[in-house]
A protein has these predicted regions:
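Hydrophobic alpha-helical connector segments
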Residues: 55, 69-101, 141, 145-147, ...
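Regular secondary-structure segments
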Residues: 15, 19, 65, 69-72, ...
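Hydrophobic/aromatic-rich alpha-helical bundle segments in the mid-to-C-terminal region
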Residues: 103-104, 108, 117, 139-187, ...
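Helix-turn-helix
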Residues: 9, 13, 17-51, 55
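Short helix-capping/turn signature of helix-turn-helix
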Residues: 46, 108-113
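Pre-recognition alpha-helix immediately N-terminal to the DNA-recognition helix
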Residues: 9-17, 63, 87, 91
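Alpha-helical DNA-contacting segments of helix-turn-helix folds
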Residues: 54-60, 67, 123, 127
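Amphipathic alpha-helical packing segments from all-alpha helical-bundle domains
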Residues: 65, 94, 115-141, 151-155, ...
Length: 200
């Protein structure tokens, strides 16, 4: 197997292990077992657990960034703030279908200060900037243009997405389509629409 492919297999195994055990609880030995390789091979490829984690969060962050960018650049994004938000959520849910716990690897609070935490922070910063741009465009279309309001709205959006992903992690039997529908109902109800109207 080419080295590049084997590295990707190791990263995928590491994401699963970090999702299951957190950074603090994960070990290179456990990752090696999941990837069906030796711990020595992982060290020769990556050098350290921190470097493995950095590769993981880079992959996760890139996946989210691309999915959200595609949703934001879609013509359907112009259909209104609510529809745009649901489209972004649908893109995120589709990306993580079958492995919703991957999202939380990027937000793992057990990661110590150092290169690993810096790598995760870098990815979160990119996603926060992307979220701010999307929120500003969507909510600007309905009149919310105050810069501080938009910063607050971006924080609300980020925490809402994380809450939905935590729910999904705790209910992994839910499909991406089911999560899209659930988010639609919740957001519509919070906006004051009746469920009969939403279902209709």
């Amino acid at each position: 197997m080419p080295r590049g492919e084997r590295e990707q297999l190791i990263v995928e195994a590491a994401i699963a292990e970090f999702s299951r055990a957190t950074y603090a609880g994960a070990s290179l030995a456990a990752i090696a077992a999941q990837a069906d390789v030796s711990k020595t091979l992982i060290i020769s490829y990556f050098g350290s657990k921190e470097a493995v984690y950095a590769a993981c969060v880079t992959k996760i962050g890139t996946q989210i960034e691309q999915a959200v960018a595609d949703a934001l650049n879609s013509p359907h994004h112009l259909a209104g703030a609510g529809a745009a938000g649901e489209r972004v959520l649908a893109a995120i849910f589709t990306t993580f279908e079958g492995h919703p716990g991957d999202w939380h690897v990027l937000f793992d609070r057990s990661v110590p200060h150092g290169p690993a935490r810096d790598a995760a922070r870098e990815q979160r910063t990119i996603l926060r900037q992307q979220a701010f741009a999307g929120v500003s465009r969507s909510l600007g279309s309905v009149g919310l243009t105050d810069p501080v309001d938009l910063v607050a709205a971006t924080g609300v959006w980020e925490h809402m997405v994380s809450a939905l992903m935590l729910f999904w992690r705790n209910h992994p039997e839910e499909s991406a389509a089911a999560m899209v529908a659930r988010a639609h109902r919740v957001l519509a109800a919070m906006a004051g629409h009746t469920l009969d109207r939403v279902r209709g």
